[in-house]
């Protein structure tokens, strides 16, 4: 019998096969499909086109489709408002009740938080960072509107079974070193195309001990090295998180001991210092001391990568009772309403407001340069987001540095890229 890794086992089950091998083309059952306000309308148009050619006029299962408004919330243009209107009407017509509007949160936070994500699932999303759900032991990947329209119609999609890459992470980071630094370091070594169309499996004692927030950060950025998906075997914290949010059954898959990997990589992060991805590539990574003193105009704390409660708490502790630098716009956007409320209750939002930060509703706006913090020509941002290519957060002549929440918070205070000086416990 062929030895299989986690991804292969999940895909084999979804395809109704005993085993699959890399390079094999399969048709797989989809457990959950997600679109957001930017990708729902093109998916809907293609779905209707399929229906006009004799395809299904109704979605395969309205309970397995989730729609989230997060990219332009509240709508910042007439076009965005129209996209959202079209999506609302389609959801109403098709009986899709799982539609989250009015700044409920970023899709990749809302889905796990609301109990839609479980180990062993096949999840597809019309967004490249759908790979985030691999943190829960699911096979999750992004796709375009055409493929998603076929999923809406049939509940199935095709995959080429990916080659696998195993990344073992060991060691206990110290100080202000977190999951963001770990994944930036990995991408810096492997490169933005070093894992193209590969299933990246994260293992090792660092991953095993990492909390849910950190694990989501790692898997979220797997696509930034070209991966088809990132995946981890769920640890106890992850299983507790899932069970607290859903009573539905699930199956946890583990890789066979002798399963094959195209590549194996090992990273010891014991002595890692905070990392910064410099313009204009995510793999242009250096230790923070190499770029300290770089002027910034904006600091952004949020996104599906680092907008969780743990991230906000780290930043608030770094800020304390200090004030944001007078020349810096410090923008904070919690990843969901649930996170926002908890941060309010615990005084974290008050810390940001008293420091002079701009606290926005949950959403993706600043990350993709859509609204709530667009950069002008020549401006520089340091952000907890996942991409920094030219023009990502605004004008093509602007620049973006990526860093962890502590570095972003300290930089907002100092007005230049800075490493936190305060003592911190063990990272990750």
Swiss-Prot record:
Enzyme class: lyase
Pathway of action: Organic acid metabolism; 2-oxosuberate biosynthesis
GO molecular function per UniProt: 3-isopropylmalate dehydratase activity; 4 iron, 4 sulfur cluster binding; homoaconitate hydratase activity; metal ion binding
E.C. no: 4.2.1.114
UniProt xrefs under InterPro entries: Acnase/IPM_dHydase_lsu_aba_1/3, Acoase/IPM_deHydtase_lsu_aba, Aconitase_4Fe-4S_BS, Aconitase_4Fe-4S_dom, HAcnase/IPMdehydase_lsu_prok, Homoacnase/IPMdehydase_lsu, IPM_dehydratase_rel_enz, IPMI_cat
Subunit structure: Heterotetramer of 2 HacA and 2 HacB proteins.
Family per record: Belongs to the aconitase/IPM isomerase family. LeuC type 2 subfamily.
PANTHER family: HOMOACONITASE, MITOCHONDRIAL, HOMOACONITASE, MITOCHONDRIAL-RELATED
Protein's UniProt name: Probable methanogen homoaconitase large subunit
Gene designation: hacA
